[in-house]
Amino acid sequence: MSETNSGGKCPVMHGANSTENRDVMNWWPEALNLDILHQHDHKTNPMGEDFDYREEVKKLDFEAVKKDLHALMTDSQDWWPADWGHYGGLMIRMSWHAAGTYRIQDGRGGGGTGNQRFAPLNSWPDNVSLDKARRLLWPIKKKYGNKLSWADLIILAGTVAYESMGLPSYGFSFGREDIWHPEKDIYWGNEKEWLAPSDERYGDVEKPDTMENPLAAVQMGLIYVNPEGVNSQPDPIKTGEQVRVTFARMAMDDEETAALTAGGHTVGKCHGNGDAGALGPEPEAADVEEQGFGWSNPNMKGKAANAVTSGIEGAWTTHPTKFDMGYFDLLFGYEWELKKSPAGAWQWEPINMKEEDKPLDASDPSKRHNPIMTDADMAMKMDPKYRAICEKFMADPEYFKDCFARAWFKLTHRDLGPKARYIGPEAPAEDLIWQDPVPAGSTDYCEEVVKEKVADSGLSISEMVSTAWDSARTFRGSDMRGGANGARIRLAPQKDWEGNEPARLSKVLKVYEQISAETGASVADVIVLAGSVGIEKAAKAAGYEVRVPFLKGRGDATDEMTDAPSFEYLEPVADGFRNWQKKDYIVKPEELLLDRAQLMGLTAPEMTVLIGGMRVLGTNHGGTKYGVFTDREGQLTNDFFVNLTDMAYSWKPVGNGTYEIRDRKTDQTKWTASRVDLVFGSNSILRSYAEVYAQDDNGEKFVKDFIAAWTKVMNNDRFDVQA
């Protein structure tokens, strides 16, 4: 490269391509950021719009992939040597730390997208050395190409690692589609530094259940809890309390938590045999010559035993490449005392351990070292509930292995969705309650007869549309839970949610259940089809003959198929589409709207057209009139947008997040509005969409676009026909 410009002015333009460029959100940080609705489109995806991974992966030679992974486990590489000549522990940690970011509160995180390849996860302090694990997998990814996503490979590698060390797998499903840039919708925490004290995300760090929602990890940059103890201060009882809350927020109960802790720490080791301060920067901060690697270790010198990751040093068991009962044998067979690792981290070591019980050195089989336990491990012994579970496991090793295999499957498949989405020969046939099973619904009924009965039922357009919406809006694309299939709006806890207006809902469901009994259609299908009836009726009243697309075949779930406590997390605390929120929150109503729209898989234009349609259809919660900018309520018109953009009106705040829309000449109040309504006129991007639908030539376009977006929402969870 020429040095002509050395010392002179920069020869390229500053601005769009500069890392110093200040974008809109820098200048106006309080502005509504719509970016979470504009993620993962075809412009960032090198595979193109026509590529369908879930079809492509079905062509994969599943057995050949597993054979290659088994071979990889013991093929130690000089550039990153394997502990005891086996990469199993490293691969399990990689899989675990991918899947373990899942949290049940919003369904985000998890291993379903291959996001560990990108910031911030690729550079989290808890993910030190996982860059090496993924690079070890590259030859396999390269070989199988488009038929095997990174997301599937990362999770499969951990499962095969367990198999290679003696644990039969409960099963595995393919079907995880890769993303191509970091997610913008996941809130990892508000801290400004890695591993900031836990106090920053707890109301009271002494009370683990006061952790900020929807977070699950105790510190920024950790997957679960601090292995040294709460804020790096060892106290197994306190750590056990954090473990319980953290794993519960990741959808695990006490038995699953104990099984995962024990099974996860039966194999592999912690790495802290050196100075953590000597490590180079994380991948995102490393120089270009590192080629995506981070945490370079000048003291590695080709020996696995010299690695530094967590700072804790040592294996948990006598045979770290074998899945056995060694974890329990050592944890409960010895007394333990606090020590410091070579890297200065707190760890527990055994008192007077027999030499033959000590694990071999990871690089030199002529040496043995003390095993270690983290503070979380000691909680399994000292917390009474966890201890009782562990004692049950010790008394029945086969039960422990089965519990762990099932918990591992749940951990790695929780965000993949229902069983209908499973792909591959090892997908288990058993129905598991956490999969939210739904029985197949009938398609052997006359759709038109159902529609006629709904139309003659005396229900209003608002009742029909609102009930269908409430049933479908629970869908979360984050973990593929919720939605209209199953009609769980009939069951606890959904039937009693404030946002579902229980009294109205009960009245409507009685009508639908009767129609279901008379026609053979499932209640789930009747709910959705009734929404179609309401929309078609409203469109006809506005002068448009339309037919809302409909797919038969939804089933009706039962209470026995429903894990009611886990569905509590799907309860809406706000729904801008129905102009409702449960109470006042620090987060603005329009931001809550964006969050729900993103979980439902909506784009900004789809969100916009749905708001406009829902308002004129009179679907506001409790029948309020906020945002009903029309004199023709019940007709599917573009009046919401026409009147929102009409400069004949002014907008005056009247308190509690509400506004009056006044005639500029008479100062008379014409309508009322919420912040959610007015943001479609105030935000420049949303206003641009609102103006499209307000145009004189776009009345019909509005109706068509509303129906298309509505149909998308109703079918979001139809994995039985998508798979």
Curated annotation (Swiss-Prot):
Classification via CDD domains: catalase_peroxidase_1, catalase_peroxidase_2
Function: Bifunctional enzyme with both catalase and broad-spectrum peroxidase activity.
Keyword ATP-binding on entry: no
Tryptophyl-tyrosyl-methioninium (Trp-Tyr) (with M-250) crosslink, residue number(s): 96-224
Annotated GO CC locations: cytosol
Family: Belongs to the peroxidase family. Peroxidase/catalase subfamily.
Protein name per Swiss-Prot or TrEMBL: Catalase-peroxidase
Gene3D superfamilies assigned: 1.10.520.10, Peroxidase, domain 2
Cofactor mode of binding and number, as noted: Binds 1 heme b (iron(II)-protoporphyrin IX) group per dimer.
GO BP annotations listed: cellular response to hydrogen peroxide; hydrogen peroxide catabolic process
Gene that produces this protein: katG
Post-translational modification comment from the UniProt entry: Formation of the three residue Trp-Tyr-Met cross-link is important for the catalase, but not the peroxidase activity of the enzyme.
Site label Transition state stabilizer, positions: 93
Top EC group: oxidoreductase
Crosslink position(s): Tryptophyl-tyrosyl-methioninium (Tyr-Met) (with W-96): 224-250
Record keywords, A-Z: Heme, Hydrogen peroxide, Iron, Metal-binding, Oxidoreductase, Peroxidase
Provenance organism: Marinobacter nauticus (strain ATCC 700491 / DSM 11845 / VT8) (Marinobacter aquaeolei)
UniProt GO molecular function: catalase activity; heme binding; metal ion binding
Cofactor section: heme b
EC number: 1.11.1.21
Binding positions (heme b): 265
HAMAP family per record: Catal_peroxid (MF_01961)
One Pfam family linked to the record: peroxidase
Catalytic activity: H2O2 + AH2 = A + 2 H2O; 2 H2O2 = O2 + 2 H2O
Subunit structure comment from the entry: Homodimer or homotetramer.
Catalytic residues, chain numbering: 97
